[in-house]
């Protein structure tokens, strides 16, 4: 089990990092502006939640990386006993998630004991690290407001490639991602087809060296680590689990240097399963 960062350690470095304001406003921070996400997948969430009568001990909130858990063998292997609920939507930024859990009412009928949040990578092209961290904080605060007893695991934003820096050209990556994104946009994606598309990308393996990874992500993670209070909110950065011994990002784990392969999802599951168990037990004792 990977150790959760103690609150004391987080406090010790708090003076060295930017401060998250108590109340982030959309006028001051575009990453907390709620972005309408009234699309078929969101509507499907509401139907499934209603049909299951809100069943589920843990919810996963995020973007296409979380969305991609669907159809993965590792999903049931690692989390099946928790009756997990996948609330990931491809292309989501922090503002989309904020809309979904407020105006979109995705949490209304759910009674989760724990939540896993991994969001922010889609903000990196337009927002600062401070703004993105503010968006993540706003999601955490909204979760706490709606579900006072919930325990929250905030994951550091996963490492990813920068622009124009992979061994494969950006044209290759873009062309490989297009059909994946198109399939994910469908109300009911064809999982077999998605897996075939990912395998095609996996055949073009390469590694992005550490020096060429997106530089904004470590900055975001430094700031959101401060959200860990050791009681309700816990922070964990599992980014190193996806890297090789030199800190590079292998294509066999992230075929397009952003989305995970089946191996990548297994790594993710192994890295947080024990943490989820711990958070659910904490909730049960209260």
For the regions a protein language model found, what residue spans apply to each?
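N-terminal secretory targeting modules
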Residues: 1-61, 65-78, 145, 175, ...
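Acidic/histidine-rich helix-loop elements
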Residues: 28-36, 86-96, 257
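N-terminal/domain-start segments enriched in small and hydrophobic, helix-friendly residues
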Residues: 36, 95-130, 248-249, 254-257, ...
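Active-site flanking residues adjacent to catalytic metal/cofactor-binding acidic residues
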Residues: 61-63, 155, 236
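Oxyanion-hole/transition-state-stabilizing segment in secreted/luminal serine hydrolases
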Residues: 67-83, 94-169, 206-207
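Solvent-exposed, polar/charged alpha-helical surfaces in well-ordered, non-transmembrane soluble domains
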Residues: 87, 95, 99, 130, ...
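Catalytic His-Asp segment of secreted/periplasmic serine-dependent ester chemistry enzymes
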Residues: 161-286
């Amino acid at each position: 089990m990977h150790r959760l960062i103690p609150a004391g350690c987080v406090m010790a470095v708090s003076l060295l990092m930017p401060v998250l304001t108590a109340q982030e406003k959309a006028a001051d921070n575009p990453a907390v502006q709620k972005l309408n996400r009234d699309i078929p997948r969101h509507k499907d969430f509401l139907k499934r939640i209603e049909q299951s009568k809100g069943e589920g001990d843990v919810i996963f909130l995020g973007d296409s990386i979380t969305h991609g858990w669907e159809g993965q063998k590792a999903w049931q292997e690692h989390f099946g006993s928790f009756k997990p609920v996948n609330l990931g939507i491809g292309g989501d930024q922090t503002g989309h998630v904020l809309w979904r859990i407020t105006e979109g009412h995705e949490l209304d009928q759910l009674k989760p004991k724990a939540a896993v949040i991994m969001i922010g990578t889609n903000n990196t092209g337009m927002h600062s690290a401070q703004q993105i961290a503010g968006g993540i904080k706003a999601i955490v605060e909204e979760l706490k407001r709606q579900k006072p007893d919930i325990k929250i695991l905030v994951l550091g934003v996963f490492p990813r490639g920068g622009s124009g820096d992979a061994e494969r050209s950006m044209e290759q990556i873009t062309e490989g991602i297009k059909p994946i994104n198109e399939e994910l946009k469908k109300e009911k994606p064809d999982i077999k087809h998605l897996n075939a598309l990912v395998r095609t990308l996996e055949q073009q393996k390469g590694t992005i060296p550490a020096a060429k990874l997106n530089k904004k992500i470590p900055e975001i993670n430094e700031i959101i680590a401060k959200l860990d209070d050791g009681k309700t909110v816990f922070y964990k950065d599992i980014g190193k689990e996806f890297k090789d011994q030199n800190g590079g990002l292998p294509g066999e784990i992230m075929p397009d240097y952003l989305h995970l392969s089946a191996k990548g999802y297994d790594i993710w599951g192994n890295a947080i399963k024990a943490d989820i168990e711990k958070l659910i037990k904490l909730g049960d004792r209260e």
